């Protein structure tokens, strides 16, 4: 039996980059949860699914942060605990990501409405929380989670490479669902985009007002960009983990390449940050309210005093000015 290769060593700069990625992902996931709590009128079914994805990403970022901070050098109880939490959260994140794409496909292309979508949401909960939980509990009970020498991770613990069937458990605890998502996400979003483009083409023949048509095209263009970017961002983040997984199976020393290690660390930990960029910072309805909230917090300072010592009175507002400055929630586009 050949001796196992030395573990992948992480230099402080690599750990710092991955820790920063974990922190930004946790911040982004927390911001998504906060926007859901602050504005009830924005709680559509799709954004409700995004809330559960954000919770999974938040737990994933926290568990990865602990793993990278500890940089485990061998098996221990907290290595198993961290590996179990990250396995559950990471697998759940895969399921919720596909669930959002499937929901958009069924609601837009198949026009699913009413009780049917309610049953669908319950099914998403059962699958997206239940399946990862069963897999994780089984992996812990069978002692499959443990130290992996950072060959298929970046400092954190996952599947014990000493287990005889470690490849099977790597597939069950993440890689199988990851590779299925590579196929399902582009396929579902492509079908949704084709349906939307077909509908816009049909509607354009009956829109005589050019300004409305221009606004429709502008909003649909932003939606089309998102439908393309969502699967591309997911694949762009996760592919480095898959590459190192394949290199580990092949026994290639390239698995320890520093650039590949850093990309793997960022890709596995930054999903929450990427979702925040897409669905908060690049969604005008949420971005406008968030910036307004920040401006209100910054402007809520005590009134300045005039040289005479009396506080300056605020300038009287013009009639109708306050109504013009406040847009109704329904007027804010979701793109």
Swiss-Prot record:
Disulfide bonds: none annotated. The keyword Cell membrane applies. Residues 300-335 are annotated as: Disordered. The keyword Membrane applies. Belongs to the G-protein coupled receptor 2 family. Orphan receptor that promotes neuronal differentiation of radial glial progenitors (RGPs). The activity of this receptor is mediated by a G(q)-protein that activates a phosphatidylinositol-calcium second messenger. This is G-protein coupled receptor 157. It comes from Homo sapiens (Human).
């Amino acid at each position: 039996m050949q001796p196992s290769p030395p573990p992948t060593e992480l230099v402080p700069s690599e750990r710092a980059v991955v820790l920063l990625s974990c922190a930004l992902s946790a911040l982004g996931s927390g911001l998504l949860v906060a926007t859901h709590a602050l504005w009830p009128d924005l709680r559509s079914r799709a954004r409700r699914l995004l809330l559960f994805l954000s919770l999974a990403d938040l737990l994933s970022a926290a568990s990865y942060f602990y793993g990278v901070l500890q940089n485990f050098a061998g098996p221990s109880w907290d290595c198993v605990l961290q590996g179990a939490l990250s396995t559950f959260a990471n697998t759940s994140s895969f399921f919720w990501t596909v669930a959002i794409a499937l929901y958009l496909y069924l609601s837009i292309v198949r026009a699913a409405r009413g009780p049917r979508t309610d049953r669908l949401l319950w099914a998403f909960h059962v699958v997206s929380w239940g399946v990862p939980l069963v897999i994780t509990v089984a992996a812990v009970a069978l002692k499959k989670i443990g130290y992996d020498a950072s060959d298929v991770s970046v400092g954190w613990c996952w599947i014990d490479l000493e287990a005889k069937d470690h490849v099977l458990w790597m597939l069950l605890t993440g890689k199988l669902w990851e590779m299925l998502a590579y196929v399902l996400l582009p396929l579902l979003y492509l079908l949704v985009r084709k349906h939307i483009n077909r509908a816009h083409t049909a509607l354009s023949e009956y829109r005589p007002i050019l300004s409305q048509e221009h606004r429709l095209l502008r909003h649909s263009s932003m939606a089309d960009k998102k439908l393309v970017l969502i699967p591309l961002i997911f694949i762009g983040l996760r592919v480095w983990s898959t590459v190192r997984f394949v290199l580990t199976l092949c026994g290639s020393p390239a698995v320890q390449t520093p650039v590949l290690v850093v990309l793997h660390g960022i890709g596995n930990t930054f999903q929450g940050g990427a979702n925040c960029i897409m669905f908060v910072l690049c969604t005008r309805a949420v971005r406008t309210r968030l910036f307004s909230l920040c401006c209100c917090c910054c402007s809520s300072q005590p009134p300045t005093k005039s040289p005479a010592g009396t506080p300056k009175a605020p300038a009287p507002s013009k009639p109708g000015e306050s109504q013009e400055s406040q847009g109704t929630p329904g007027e804010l586009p979701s793109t």
